[in-house]
Amino acid sequence: MAIPILDALTSSSGKKNSAEFSIHSTSNPTNPEEPNITSEADNAEDLAALGYKQEFQRGLSLFSVFSVSFSLLGLLPSVATTLPYSIGYTGTPGLLWGWLIAMVFIICIALSMAELCSAMPTSGGLYYAAAVLAPEGWGPLAAWFTGWSNYIAQLVGGPSINYSTAAMLLGAVNIGNPNYEVQNYQLFLVSIAIQFIHFILASMPTKYIAKLNSVGTYLNTLFLFISMIVILAMSSKNHGFNETSKVWSHIENYTDWPDGFAILMSFCGVIWTMSGYDAPFHMSEETANASVNAPRGIILTAAIGGIMGWVMQIVIAYTVVDQTAVVTGSDSMWATYLSQCLPKRAALGILSLTIVSSFLMGQSNLIASSRIAYSYARDGVLPYSEWVATVNPITKTPIRAVFVNFVIGVLILFLAFAGAITIGAVFSVTAIAAFTAFVAPVAMRVFFVKDADFRTGPFNLGKFSKPIGFCSVSFVALMIPILCFPSVKNPTPAEMNWTCLVFGAPMLAVLIWYAISGRKWFKGPRINLASEGDNSTLEGVELYTGSEELPQKKEKE
């Protein structure tokens, strides 16, 4: 139940009563606008009030957790990968206006997510929030739907990034040796090799992960600026820049749909690029002062990523020589674009920087996705949850969850042998699955929970919470069907957009699983709702009374 749950969360049994302690408010009593810098014990106590014991080391600072999510955006490789959407539908106006308009709503989603993260800083993230905020009787189903949508996005996102990295790596070989032809098995093997390296890196102790991702953030930012400077300098020297009026207003519609609808379709590029800024939410149990730093990480990632990404789009729009050749060419759009505006060696150099950034992006994805797997397994959602939900006593990281995601990623990569259409359809699901999960708990907050009954954390939107949340939900509700449209009205199988099938089929499968079996044993996240002398169980969640043993999934009835 949404309202009683929110009240009960602030009166958990233990050392402090509800008048003294609330997990949803850690403001400084002398200055309510200035949050306290909480201690390790305070972080653990906040987490215990959410129903979980502290198992990770809180070794991530604000910059560290921002580094994970910013690296996961991978602006340089993401912009390169999404050119078929951003410029491939409406030309340069799609690059510029598409990114700018969509970012307004993406920032709204980030703000709404950050507010929930501040109130409920747990690795379960969106899945946990959906259960707590859902109306009476719907908590378990809301958590199940949100959790699986988010997990599917993460599972598919990692292999898609690594496959793109492998394709760019072998494409660089092709630039050096034009007679070289890339084979599917080579893409598969290189992708697996990259994924295995990520498995090793994501299993390291948190302090090393923090350092690695900090370095990754610096490199991603540096490489992005180097790429923009080189492209601008070479273009200015060789062929000049495109006219401003043409760049901003001359629509080259490469679809069968009206210009306005085609611009909306171009939003796919920025939506795919920005589908990783929820990572701080899932890393909150490893973050110091999580109710403050994790939401800040979400907002910083969305804002800085959005601005820097748009600047990169402006650079491309003003320097592309022949956008029709880029869109209709048989080679990679990014490679074609670079070859137009740069000499061969410079193009190869920028492509190399893109490959390194893409590698770091994939590594961040596995870190975030493994924490999601761990949090879901801890609540009994995944098969063999008892085995998966284990933190290695030496590294203090969920190595088994990392391994599970690595294996599933390898299985997904086998689809590369089925051809470009199949593997492309699988990978296109990342954006729609991620943003469906992003707004599910926001919708619960907007439509089912009154402001007076929602106890905010140090970061909150105040009276703007519901208006911003409504904008977030409306945007995603509009974009979901648009992202499923093909670019032509009468598509062949090769031209069809299979996103609706690739996302719909597994989601339908997990919903059927819930109807047949899951509803009998899955009661939502296990949270500590009982105050002293009160053993009542609230619907929509499963009571966990603080046993030292890890809660296990109930036996199937």
Curated annotation (Swiss-Prot):
The chain crosses the membrane at residues 60-80, 94-114, 214-234, 261-281, 297-317, 348-368, 407-427, 468-488, 498-518. Residues 17-38 are annotated as: Disordered. It comes from the Eukaryota. The keyword Transcription regulation does not apply. It is a multi-pass membrane protein. GO terms for molecular function: amino acid transmembrane transporter activity; gamma-aminobutyric acid transmembrane transporter activity. Keywords: Amino-acid transport, Membrane, Transmembrane, Transmembrane helix, Transport. Pfam families: AA_permease_2 (PF13520). GO terms for biological process: amino acid transmembrane transport; gamma-aminobutyric acid transport. This is Uncharacterized amino-acid permease C74.04. It comes from Schizosaccharomyces pombe (strain 972 / ATCC 24843). The lineage of its organism: Eukaryota, Fungi, Dikarya, Ascomycota, Taphrinomycotina.
